Amino acid sequence: MRKNTVRGDALILTVSDQIEQLEYILENLPDICFHIAAPVHFSEKIGVLESKYNVRLVTVTTDQQIDFLVNMCDFLLDINHFQEVDAIVSRFVQAEKPVFAFDNTVHGNQGQEVFLSSTPDKLVFR
């Protein structure tokens, strides 16, 4: 399978380690730097991802830190299960930056581009 050559920075803001199709996305978007951010400690499942060259783990505890990530990142991946964290989807929408989600992780109808979780390649090659 061909690799996508898109470059840039993506944000995933979560409070859980249940992130849909994460391994597939990391493998197939090697030129994207993924900032996985959380206001909590990372589980071992997520912690081991820091060894990947295109993953940055960030603990966020203030609105200023989140605003910095919104400004820095090119798009948001709304692919975390459970609740939306700190209204991150609306922050990206207000910043006029794209938000991509899966059908089983989308947080409300806030203008996200939604893909079937069973076909992650559609998101990757978007």
Predicted regions, residues:
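Short alpha-helical segment that forms part of, or immediately flanks, the ligand-binding pocket
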Residues: 67, 86-94, 108
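Short glycine-rich donor-binding/catalytic loop of glycosyltransferases
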Residues: 81, 97-108
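Short acidic active-site motifs
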Residues: 21, 45, 64-66, 87, ...
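Nucleotide-activated donor-binding/catalytic signature segment of Leloir-type glycosyltransferases, i.e.
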Residues: 44-61
